[in-house]
């Protein structure tokens, strides 16, 4: 998986601002790890990709 999304230059995914409170659930179990990718796609509308990299888990634009 790439550390970059669309126009977002993320050297580290930890730099990305997680928007939405639904991400509080993904830390519960590894089984939910596939769910975070689905949620990221839905959060895409509220994501801001650019030099500031305010992407949800850096998956904005995917």
Swiss-Prot record:
Keywords for the protein's UniProt record, in alphabetical order: Metal-binding, Metal-thiolate cluster
Keyword flag Metal-binding: yes
Tissue: Expressed in roots.
A single GO BP: intracellular copper ion homeostasis
Molecular function GO labels: copper ion binding; zinc ion binding
The family this protein is said to belong to: Belongs to the metallothionein superfamily. Type 15 family.
Function: Metallothioneins have a high content of cysteine residues that bind various heavy metals.
Name listed for the protein in its UniProt record: Metallothionein-like protein 3A
Species, as recorded: Oryza sativa subsp. japonica (Rice)
Gene: MT3A
